[in-house]
From Swiss-Prot:
Core component of nucleosome. Nucleosomes wrap and compact DNA into chromatin, limiting DNA accessibility to the cellular machineries which require DNA as a template. Histones thereby play a central role in transcription regulation, DNA repair, DNA replication and chromosomal stability. DNA accessibility is regulated via a complex set of post-translational modifications of histones, also called histone code, and nucleosome remodeling. It is found in: Nucleus; Chromosome. The nucleosome is a histone octamer containing two molecules each of H2A, H2B, H3 and H4 assembled in one H3-H4 heterotetramer and two H2A-H2B heterodimers. The octamer wraps approximately 147 bp of DNA. It comes from the Eukaryota. A motif (SPKK motif 2) lies at residues 11-14. This is Histone H2B.1, sperm. It comes from Echinus esculentus. Contains 3 SPKK motifs which may interact with the minor groove of A/T-rich DNA sites. Phosphorylation of this motif may regulate DNA binding. This motif is reiterated in both termini of histone H1 and in the C-terminus of plant H2A, but its presence in the N-terminus seems to be unique to sea urchin histones H2B. Belongs to the histone H2B family.
């Protein structure tokens, strides 16, 4: 799970899709 925080904080573009696809990414 710590890996998800790294890419999310580094890539501001990934923050957008992760907000709506948080359950799909998990």
């Amino acid at each position: 799970m710590p890996s998800q925080k790294s890419p999310t904080k580094r890539s501001p573009t990934k923050r957008s899709p992760q907000k709506g696809g948080k359950g799909a990414k998990r």
